[in-house]
A protein has these predicted regions:
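Short, surface-exposed coil-to-beta transition loops
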Residues: 76-81, 102-106, 129-132
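N-terminal secretory signal peptides
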Residues: 21-74
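Beta-propeller domains
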Residues: 72-91
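Structural signature of eukaryotic scaffold interfaces centered on beta-propeller domains
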Residues: 56-62, 107-114
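Short coil/turn segments at the loop-to-beta-strand junctions that recur within blades
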Residues: 97-102, 151-154
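Bacterial N-terminal signal peptides that target proteins for export
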Residues: 1-7
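N-terminal signal peptide c-region/cleavage motif recognized by signal peptidases
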Residues: 15-17
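Acidic, small-residue rich beta-repeat scaffolds with periodic aromatic anchors
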Residues: 21-35, 39, 111-163
Length: 163
């Protein structure tokens, strides 16, 4: 009887950990402290958004150690963005637009200077559930790997990700 209870408790703990949202502290990045490089406008998309990129490149790093994550509107309740490498000036595009996030969300993208985790609230490329929360790892100029997704949950459930 006791061994069954212990087993059930262990299974509950393991299940809870598997469902837990990723946390910023689990994706550390070392902040860049050097002089910022000028932004490189090497492709057509970068040249199209040159004004927004140049303006953002003068801001302090705010994401993944050495990047400035810049966003701007692309329609009603829609944003797009890019990460500018302060060390090299290279531009890495966020590979989707974000829209339709819940009204209680004040910022559809959450990020930290000392973390590679990008938390995205809303629909990606105008597809899917607007209440979804997507978690991506930024790895050397690429938002490339979705590491977790939660749907149809209240925003209070995501406080753990903000630590």
């Amino acid at each position: 009887m006791n061994s069954t209870r212990i087993l059930l408790v262990l299974l509950a703990v393991v299940s809870q950990q598997a469902l837990a949202a990723p946390r910023f502290v689990d994706f550390p990045a070392t902040p860049y402290r050097g002089k910022p490089a000028g932004v490189h406008l090497r492709d057509a998309k970068s040249r199209e958004y040159a004004s927004a990129l140049r303006t953002a490149s003068h801001q302090p790093t705010n994401f993944a150690g050495r990047y400035v994550l810049a966003t701007w509107g692309c329609g009603a309740s829609c944003i797009m963005g890019a990460a500018i490498d302060a060390k090299t000036g290279a531009v890495a595009w966020v590979p989707f637009t974000v829209c339709c996030w819940n009204l209680e969300i004040t910022a559809p993208l959450e990020y930290r200077r000392e973390s590679r985790l990008l938390v995205v609230h809303g629909s990606l490329d105008e597809q899917g559930d607007g209440s979804a929360v997507h978690y991506y790892e930024f790895d050397n100029a690429n938002v490339h790997r979705r590491i977790h997704e939660l749907s149809n949950r209240s925003t209070s459930a995501f406080e753990a990700a903000r630590t």
